[in-house]
């Protein structure tokens, strides 16, 4: 029997260096174990320089998984994070995709994208 996996996705749009206001939206996704999930981060600015992806699990501090450097078109993973597990890419100038592969129960949590325009 496949177990269901619930992901709560919280998106934090970019915060300009000129503003401290952040607005967010959340979306709940449930996927069976062994499957994949794709999350879209919509950016209010074209080609934000750095977009970070975080996982926050109950009782733990948020963990940065990786970030996307749009200036150099590269993905930088945190130490111990598997390239086979997490991927990200720019799907448009104002949108980033984050892919979680081969989901397991330990992947449950709140995923955040956070970025800035400078």
From Swiss-Prot:
This protein's major location comes to membrane
Q: Which residues form the signal peptide?
A: 1-17
All disulfide bonds of the chain are 41-113
Which BP terms in the Gene Ontology apply to this protein? adaptive immune response; innate immune response
Which SUPFAM superfamilies does the record associate with it? Immunoglobulin
Residue ranges occupied by any Ig-like domain in the UniProt entry: 18-118
Q: Which UniProt keywords apply?
A: Adaptive immunity, Cell membrane, Disulfide bond, Immunity, Immunoglobulin domain, Innate immunity, Membrane, Receptor, Signal, T cell receptor
Q: Which Gene3D superfamilies match?
A: Immunoglobulins
Please state where this protein is localized.
Answer: Cell membrane
- Cross-referenced Pfam families: V-set
Mind telling me which GO cellular component terms the entry cites? Answer: external side of plasma membrane; T cell receptor complex
Q: Which InterPro entries match?
A: Ig-like_dom (IPR007110), Ig-like_dom_sf (IPR036179), Ig-like_fold (IPR013783), Ig_V-set (IPR013106), TRG_var/const_region (IPR051117)
Assembly mode: Gamma-delta TR is a heterodimer composed of a gamma and delta chain; disulfide-linked. The gamma-delta TR is associated with the transmembrane signaling CD3 coreceptor proteins following the stoichiometry: a single gamma-delta TR heterodimer associates with one CD3D-CD3E heterodimer, one CD3G-CD3E heterodimer and one CD247 homodimer forming a stable octameric structure. Upon activation, gamma-delta TR complex associates with FCER1G to initiate intracellular signaling.
Q: What does this protein do?
A: V region of the variable domain of T cell receptor (TR) gamma chain that participates in the antigen recognition. Gamma-delta TRs recognize a variety of self and foreign non-peptide antigens frequently expressed at the epithelial boundaries between the host and external environment, including endogenous lipids presented by MH-like protein CD1D and phosphoantigens presented by butyrophilin-like molecule BTN3A1. Upon antigen recognition induces rapid, innate-like immune responses involved in pathogen clearance and tissue repair.
What is the protein name for this chain? T cell receptor gamma variable 8
Q: Which organism is it from?
A: Homo sapiens
């Amino acid at each position: 029997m496949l177990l269901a996996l619930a992901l709560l996705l919280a998106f934090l749009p970019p915060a300009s260096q000129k503003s401290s206001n952040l607005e967010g939206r959340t979306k709940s996704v449930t996927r069976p174990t062994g499957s994949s999930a794709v999350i879209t981060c919509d950016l209010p600015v074209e080609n934000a320089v750095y977009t970070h992806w975080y996982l926050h699990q109950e009782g733990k501090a948020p963990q940065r998984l990786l970030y996307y450097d749009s200036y150099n078109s590269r993905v930088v993973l945190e130490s111990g994070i598997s390239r086979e597990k997490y991927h990200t890419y720019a799907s448009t100038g104002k949108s980033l995709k984050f892919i979680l592969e081969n989901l397991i129960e330990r992947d449950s949590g709140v995923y955040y994208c956070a970025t800035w325009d400078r």
